From Swiss-Prot:
Any single biological process term in GO: 'de novo' IMP biosynthetic process
GO cellular component, one term: cytosol
Catalytic activity: 2-formamido-N(1)-(5-O-phospho-beta-D-ribosyl)acetamidine + ATP = 5-amino-1-(5-phospho-beta-D-ribosyl)imidazole + ADP + phosphate + H(+)
Top-rank taxon: Bacteria
Signal peptide boundaries: none
Entries under Gene3D superfamilies matching the protein: PurM-like C-terminal domain, PurM-like, N-terminal domain
Principal subcellular localisation of the protein: cytoplasm
Species the sequence originates in: Cronobacter sakazakii (strain ATCC BAA-894)
Pathway connected to this protein: Purine metabolism; IMP biosynthesis via de novo pathway; 5-amino-1-(5-phospho-D-ribosyl)imidazole from N(2)-formyl-N(1)-(5-phospho-D-ribosyl)glycinamide: step 2/2
Protein name: Phosphoribosylformylglycinamidine cyclo-ligase
Entry keywords, A to Z: ATP-binding, Cytoplasm, Ligase, Nucleotide-binding, Purine biosynthesis
Family: Belongs to the AIR synthase family.
Top EC group: ligase
InterPro entries in UniProt: PurM-like_C_dom, PurM-like_C_sf, PurM-like_N, PurM-like_N_sf, PurM_cligase
Length: 345
């Protein structure tokens, strides 16, 4: 009988020991995110979570997202520490606009070859995002898939579940003529428009690490983590009447604000009410991007738009600013049957 070389999973490119080492590295930070409703620890086949007892008619709200090609930029610049915050932000910000409190979060991390340091850095960021949003990181999947990804390249996806009282769901149905729109400032491009960002970098020849903008490298502006609005927005909802909230993600102003507008209403945005942060001016100029395309692709300094009764607007701005946000009145709702749902003037 001919001797054959004994093959192992590691020979095929999957290092189970590296996966176990990663779990050991992240246990501590994951534990910090725990909520009282979570039952059991990491490592079960499924994560168990009870519903908070304060809800009379709890409705679960779920969401999933990624960070798009911002990830490519982070990999190229070898900066993995905040991409996990982006991942959580993209999910929990989508939940809170419906009035939901995030409960738990799971992540999926896929790579061709598992680099424990890189993966731990990403998951530390995920845990930080969960802490910022009061959400428990209850589990995840780390998939090492040789032949599927080039080298140390990786991709991430997030999944979040939240809860809202049925009678307090925010769905935009109460939006009315005369409502005031309040903006929450973004921290940068957040996690949208990065294919255009990368194209602008390519065409302009700008090196994000050596190009200075407002006293710091362009890379710092581009990789600034997506702002998580959960805690201040939940406090706003608790204290004041809120009719609708739009999270400005892919599609920018033109596509996200109409998602929360009832028929026969139009959002009128006052362009003079704020100044674009420097990074958006740089992107527009370096890429010769039209104003319409900027508002369609990027948040242009506005992370969320909140519609509420005019009588609540000043109180809302004051409350949000007291909670550490930068908030201002950005426009109003008017009755209109025009096809154009958003006007920026």
């Amino acid at each position: 009988m001919t001797d054959k070389t004994s093959l192992s999973y590691k020979d095929a490119g999957v290092d189970i020991d590296a996966g176990n080492a990663l779990v050991d590295r992240i246990k501590g930070v994951v534990k910090k995110t725990r909520r009282p409703e979570v039952m059991g620890g990491l490592g079960g086949f499924g994560a168990l979570c009870a519903l908070p007892q304060k809800y009379r008619e709890p409705v679960l709200v779920s969401g999933t997202d990624g960070v798009g090609t911002k990830l490519r930029l982070a990999m190229d610049l070898k900066r993995h520490d905040t991409i996990g915050i982006d991942l959580v932000a993209m999910c929990v910000n989508d939940l809170v606009v419906q009035g939901a409190e995030p409960l738990f979060f799971l992540d999926y991390y896929a790579t061709g070859k598992l680099d424990v340091d890189t993966a731990a850095s990403v998951i530390n960021g995920i845990a930080e995002g969960c802490l910022q949003s009061g959400c428990a990181l209850v589990g995840g999947e780390t998939a090492e898939m040789p032949g599927m990804y080039h080298g140390d390249d990786y991709d991430v996806a997030g999944f979040c579940v939240g809860v809202v009282e049925k009678s307090e769901i925010i769905d935009g149905s109460k939006v009315a003529d005369g409502d005031v729109l309040v903006a929450l400032a973004s921290s940068g491009p957040h996690s949208n428009g990065y294919s255009l960002v990368r194209k602008i970098l390519e065409v302009s020849g700008a090196d994000p690490q050596t190009t200075e903008l407002d006293g710091k490298p362009l890379a710092d502006h581009l990789l600034a983590p997506t702002r998580i609005y959960v805690k201040p927005v939940l406090e706003l909802i608790e204290k004041l009447e809120v009719h609708a909230i739009a999270h400005l993600t892919g599609g920018g102003f033109w596509e996200n604000i109409p998602r929360v507008l009832p028929d026969n209403t139009q959002a009128v945005i006052d362009e003079a009410s704020w100044q674009w942060p420097a990074v958006f001016n740089w992107l527009q100029q370096a890429g010769n991007v039209s104003r319409h395309e900027m508002y369609r692709t990027f948040n242009c300094g506005v992370g969320m738009v909140i519609a509420l009764p005019a009588a609540e607007a000043d109180n809302a701005v004051a409350l949000l600013n007291s909670l550490g946000e930068t908030a201002w009145k950005i426009g109003a709702i008017k009755a209109s049957d025009a096809q154009e749902r958003v006007v920026i003037a």
